Structures are given as structure tokens and as C-alpha cells.
Amino acid sequence: MSKPNQTLGEFIIENQSDFPGSSGELSRLINSLRLAAKVVNHEVNKAGLVDIIGAYGETNVQGEDQQKLDVYANNKFIQTLTNREIVCGIASEENDDFIQIEGHKGDHQNKYVVLMDPLDGSSNIDVNVSVGTIFSIYQRVTPVGTPVQKEDFLQPGNKQVAAGYIIYGTSTMLVYTTGHGVNGFTLNPALGSWYLSHPDMKFPEEGQIYSINEGNYIHFPQGVKDYIKYCQQEEGNRPYTSRYIGSMVSDIHRNMIKGGIFMYPKSSKASEGKLRLLYECNPFAFITEQAGGKASDGFQRIMDIDPTELHQRVPFFCGSKKMVEKAEEFMANAKANPQSQEFSFSSK
């Protein structure tokens, strides 16, 4: 039961009963993530005053130019989790391979692994657009006491223990789930504490916002083009409006509050999709489903996909349940009728 002015620490302690036999390890892990987020938030807020914006001069494993804040955030989250000896391994979008972590005694007694995108949307930081951190937590599948292995990270999203994101915007929020609903906490910068501000967050079943980079329209699959036309068509007084920030955390956060769909399909420029299954799609799929929404690759549930590599990419559709289902309907019809250039938009 949420309480007025409840802090994140109080909330975590109160809800440990959701996990019978819990040792408190997951609680300490989430506490460590909130600490790292506060440190990163401090740097994001003064980015225009110090030499921490702009390109770092290197590319990550994705072939993307690393921003200085990408590197800073990645280092801070890894350092915080490593120093507290509460995880056995970390995989980051910014690193080629996973990181094995052992305790100060040289042992491997911890049972959780963390996968993360330390700073999503960082290319927008120069123009003062909100950015965010995305994280996902799993229990390892290899024996405790042994070094973590790749298979500990290559688990389907339905095995997640917890997932969340931090949005660094006009206010800083941490939103997360442990499989018992979604709750949002806002940082009070004067006190340095996170307070429960958005209890039991839910996607409206139907929404009015569709979020997609329409500049890539010509490269999209026919089903996606058809769905966009459906949203734009005036016939039937459809209430849809396009809103796209270009920061995944910001777009999905808004859509969860207002109601809408976020889409990043495959395209002729990115045949497998662009977003990472493990670092971006799985955590947001878990959050979305716990908030009453839906997440898929256009044809199947995201969290049922068995990953084959750490940096695997997939198409991604998530948001209000009815909007995602309608997009899937257009995708299915385009696949079943490949010769047809347009689907009938008369359906309600």
C-alpha cells in the first residue's frame, strides 16, 4: 500500500514481502541503481557548464559515436554496482562483452545480473532534450559460486526479476517494476531523496498519440505505412496525433501517462530493427505489460523472444494495448497480402 510522501527506500523495504525468503539482495541492488542515478543526474544537470557534452571520439560496439556523457554514465553505474558487490555480472550497451564481477574474497556468490543502457538519447543532450537510463535485472542461471557466463544474460524477457528507467528531465524520475505493478519516484534535489509521486502507473487502454520517426517513412514495411495512414486519416474523426521526441525513455514515459504507442520498426536501412532487445526492448516490455499495455515486434510478444546475442536488435512496438493490437493487425494483413499496397482503412 503506497503512502503519501513515501520514500523509495521505505517503499522497497515495505514491499520486500512480495518476495518470500528474500535476502534483501534485490533491494540493495535497486538502492545502488538509485544512487548511481543521482550521480549521473548531477552531471546531466550541469552538462552545459562543463566539458562533458559532445562526442567522446570513439564508437561503441553498435558502431555509434559515443558521447562523453554515455561514457561517464556507463562508468558510474558499473563502478557503483561493482563496489557494492551485489551483482555477479553486468552487460551494457556501451561495452563489447559482459563484465564478470567477483567479491573482495575472489568469490562469485551473488545471484543477479544487470543489463543496461546507461544513457539513452544522449545525442540529444546538446539541445537540452530529456535523456534516460534503462535497466533490467535477472537471476543468473549458472551455479552461484562460479563465474558468470553469457547464458546468464541471454534470457528471454519473461525471466526478468525487475526492470526500470530513470528519466533526466524537468524533474528526475525513477520508474520501475518487480512484477507487481509499476511505480514512479521523483527526486527531490534539495533533500536528495526519491519520493513516490506516481503510484500504480497504467497505460490507458486506448491512446491518441503515435510516436515514430516519420522521416524514415519511405523505408518502413508496408504494414507500418498502413498503420500511419490509418492514424492520419480524417475519415471517422480519428483522434490521433503524432508526437516524437527521439528519446525512447521520454517518448514511452509520456505515452504511459497520456496514452499512446511507440514504434521503432525494422526498415530497409535496418533490416533487423535498431533497438536492442536486452538493453531497451525487454525492460520496457516488462514495464509496459505491468502497466497494462502491450509490447511486441509487430507479430509476437517481445518477452517471449529467445535472445541469441548480447547486442541483438529487434523491431519494437509498445504502448496502449488497443493501439498495439491495431498496429499488429495492419502488420499481419500486409504480410498476408504482400501484393496489396494498401490495406482498407474503413475498420474502426
Swiss-Prot record:
GO MF, any single term: magnesium ion binding
UniProt remark on cofactor binding: Binds 2 magnesium ions per subunit.
Binding site for Mg(2+) 1: E93, D117, L119
Entry's Gene Ontology BP terms: fructose 1,6-bisphosphate metabolic process; fructose 6-phosphate metabolic process; fructose metabolic process; gluconeogenesis; sucrose biosynthetic process
InterPro entries reported for this sequence: FBPase_C_dom, FBPase_class-1, FBPase_N, FBPtase
Binding site for substrate: D120, G121, S122, S123, N213, Y244, K274
Residues that, per the record, bind Mg(2+) 2: D117, D120, E280
Subcellular localization(s) per the UniProt record: Cytoplasm
Pathway: Carbohydrate biosynthesis; gluconeogenesis
Entry's EC annotation: 3.1.3.11
Family statement: Belongs to the FBPase class 1 family.
Subunit-level organization: Homotetramer.
Name of the protein described by the UniProt record: Fructose-1,6-bisphosphatase class 1 2
Species per Swiss-Prot/TrEMBL record: Christiangramia forsetii (strain DSM 17595 / CGMCC 1.15422 / KT0803) (Gramella forsetii)
Gene assigned in the entry: fbp2
